[in-house]
From Swiss-Prot:
Coiled-coil regions listed in the entry: 15-112
Protein name in UniProt: Putative ankyrin repeat domain-containing protein 26-like 1
Keyword Phosphoprotein (UniProt): no
Domain of life: Eukaryota
Amino acid sequence: MGTRTLQFEISDSHEKEEDLLHKNHLMQDEIARLRLEIHTIKNQILEKKYLKDIEIIKRKHEDLQKALKQNGEKSTKTIAHYSGQLTALTDENTMLRSKLEKEKQSRQRLTKWNHTIVD
């Protein structure tokens, strides 16, 4: 082999090496870009999932708020109803105690009157 052929092969080999290094850098850049794109897509998918989850939670929260409000209204009505019943029963109890006291007084008067007549 001649010097010229050897120089040509070295030059050709050097060009191939430079070309391969350039292609390697391009592929590494492409891989980095694709990884970033994959990462971005995964984040977008997660974001959509989280947004759906948030909407579901918002709806459940609204439903619970409505149920809580309805339960509060029912409790208020129930308390008002039982308060009315308690007031009515208290009034009736007061009236019956008064009647009982009058009956006791009448009985005592009758007993005294009977003792007065018998004596």
